Amino acid sequence: MQQDNRKKNNLEMEFFSDYGDANRFKVQEVIGKGSYGVVCSAIDTLTGEKVAIKKIHDIFEHISDAARILREIKLLRLLRHPDIVEIKHIMLPPSRREFKDIYVVFELMESDLHQVIKANDDLTREHYQFFLYQLLRALKYIHTANVYHRDLKPKNILANANCKLKICDFGLARVAFNDTPTTIFWTDYVATRWYRAPELCGSFYSKYTPAIDIWSIGCIFAEVLMGKPLFPGKNVVHQLDLMTDLLGTPSLDTISRVRNEKARRYLTSMRKKPPIPFAQKFPNADPLSLKLLERLLAFDPKDRPTAEEALADPYFKGLAKVEREPSCQPITKMEFEFERRKVTKEDIRELISREILEYHPQLLKDHMNGADKASFLYPSAVDQFRRQFAHLEENSGKTGPVAPLERKHASLPRSTVIHSTAVARGGQPKLMNNTNTLNPETTQNIPFNHATIQAQQRNLSAAKPSTFMGPVAPFDNGRISRDAYDPRSFIRSTNLPFSQQSAATVAMGKQQERRTTMEPEKQARQISQYNRYAPDVAINIDNNPFIMARTGMNKAENISDRIIIDTNLLQATAGIGVAAAAAAAAPGGSAHRKVGAVRYGMSKMY
């Protein structure tokens, strides 16, 4: 017995030293708490990148909560887009068949749109335009995958000080399939009433379309313009009153499409109300933005534009090029087969385990080959990580900074771990050549009024201490121009295991080490193996127009060089304005990225 235990311990240690990865992250501080978990900021010691780690505890206590977690991590794996929050990693649990908690690693975002609206009373028209552009671009991508978010609100939109927005919280999202009924029972639809489309008011049994998300985006944009919610209804009746006060009484034909009988009767008996002109409701807004907002907030869902149609609106002229905005292949029914049958906790546990393996390519390969050792335990680093979270949770409310616990035995487990990236520990990822970035030579030839910039620099004042947002980031042909020193890369999702993607593609936001060439026979075998995993996915994605790679690192070796690059990008921007360019050229760093104090920490759970 003792020999068997010793052998088991040796196997566990060997297994964990190969695949365990909790020691990869150094926990910093608690940045958010909720009923189902806690979020801490951390440092990825492999890349030096700041991340947010969300601990979700007791995920199998209620099967509905477990299904929601599975749905979200699955959708965030499939929906890879720069305007959607990215899961970078999911840690291996101590036991694949007995775990209760999971640790999900996200890219770190500094705040959310709700806090941005509260803290900034000096947002410009460029901010408003850029915010709506990002939200519609993300929504176009989501809807082309046949996914409806269903819970869009400012707290579910993460934000950075460089004006970057990312949609998060897909726990209430649903995937629509063409051969299945579009009518569902909305028992779990508890989205905030203020952003809920009128056709859903008081309705729990309804057909849903992408128009419900479009309405939510309209409410969010109006809140950005006003600085407060547009329809803060206290109940369903009050909500309908607020809507009709602004939009006027809907036609009888429109009322007939409201599913709830009581709401339908109330609207029918309502006195005739004329609509209020949006120019009167939003006196300082761009007239073009108000014309688009009227379309987004059409009472009848048939009159609302799609996200793609909204991006083609004149409001985004010179900013968005609809044909270049990313789209997504529709999600297959097999991915969400669990939604259409009765599942047990063990079924959900197995499906979540399978999702976790997507972030551990070697284990995934073993699992697909039937050689995975599911009964092995790997306790050391995960247990230490759990203690770090508990320590920070217990002390987060006390005065003064809380120092995270350090490892007492740094040698266990060893640092030779396998990750979802080919970057060596302590090394830097190699760069890709990006053929879609701005040409510095053409940038230098753009007419630029330096006298105006100097005058603007003299008039620049320090940001207020409570201000969060800096000037709007630059663009390149309708896409966000990424900083030359930004280490992130993005690619639309595929279902291929990371270890089997082409060496020149980007996997989970990281670059592979180098390109390899394959002989025809080997390539045929590789394609056959691809088809086993994802027969409908194109193999060669080298020319994917949605890849956004880091570029220009060799040209930006110091702070001044970075400022020059950012200023050149601003010079090439049409419609962003001289003030933003002045901020970029101002002394003291790349001012267009951050102005004023950034509030570190957030109440929003990822």
Curated annotation (Swiss-Prot):
The keyword Nucleus does not apply. The active site is at D151. PROSITE patterns: MAPK, PROTEIN_KINASE_ATP, PROTEIN_KINASE_DOM. ATP binds at I31, G32, K33, G34, S35, Y36, G37, V38, V39, K54. The modification Phosphothreonine is found at T187, T192. It is an enzyme of class 2 (transferase). InterPro entries: Kinase-like_dom_sf, MAP_kinase, MAP_kinase_CS, Prot_kinase_dom, Protein_kinase_ATP_BS. It holds the Pfam family Pkinase. CDD domains: STKc_TDY_MAPK. The modification Phosphotyrosine is found at Y189. Its EC number is 2.7.11.24. It catalyses: L-seryl-[protein] + ATP = O-phospho-L-seryl-[protein] + ADP + H(+); L-threonyl-[protein] + ATP = O-phospho-L-threonyl-[protein] + ADP + H(+). A motif (TXY) lies at residues 187-189. GO terms for molecular function: ATP binding; MAP kinase activity; protein serine kinase activity. Keywords: ATP-binding, Kinase, Nucleotide-binding, Phosphoprotein, Serine/threonine-protein kinase, Transferase. Activated by threonine and tyrosine phosphorylation. Residues 25-316 form the Protein kinase domain. Dually phosphorylated on Thr-187 and Tyr-189, which activates the enzyme. Belongs to the protein kinase superfamily. CMGC Ser/Thr protein kinase family. MAP kinase subfamily. The TXY motif contains the threonine and tyrosine residues whose phosphorylation activates the MAP kinases. PANTHER family: MITOGEN-ACTIVATED PROTEIN KINASE. This is Mitogen-activated protein kinase 20. It comes from Arabidopsis thaliana. The lineage of its organism: Eukaryota, Viridiplantae, Streptophyta, Embryophyta, Tracheophyta. The gene is MPK20.
